[in-house]
Regions:
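Basic, Lys/Arg-enriched alpha-helical interface segments
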Residues: 3-75
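Enriched for short, Lys/Arg-rich terminal
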Residues: 75-118
Length: 118
């Protein structure tokens, strides 16, 4: 079964996203967004070239993206579903099918300013 590895930058992104979600929308909203992120990461690990994922070679070689909106239904839980997720997972398929999660960025950001230059 494929696995994923989260970069330090992506880990910091997740912490920031969940902190902001908690502060602005409360604990249940944070829990919903956390479940959504986990569902998206697992979906990417299971099927890296899944429907909804995009080749992003224009940003960096081998880079792919997947918007959290595509994992909304899989992340549905007791407290509901995230209605309008706004983040994109940027990742690469590495050796041995290990998925490298590079960043999680807001979809309104100029992503090229926040991605590693490789």
């Amino acid at each position: 079964m494929p696995q994923y590895r989260i970069s330090n930058a992506a880990r910091a992104d997740i912490v920031d996203i969940l902190r902001l979600s908690q502060t602005q929308f409360g604990d249940q909203a944070r829990q919903r967004y956390q479940a959504l992120i986990l569902a998206a990461l697992q979906a990417i690990a299971d099927t890296p070239y899944r429907v909804g994922s995009h080749d992003r070679d224009e940003l960096a070689p081998g880079l792919r993206s997947y918007h959290l909106v595509y994992s909304r239904q899989q992340a549905k839980q007791l407290h509901g579903v995230v209605k309008s997720p706004r983040h994109i997972v940027f990742y690469r398929v590495g050796d041995g099918d290990v998925i490298e999660i590079v960043r999680l960025l807001h979809d309104a950001m100029e992503v090229q300013l926040h991605l590693p230059n490789d």
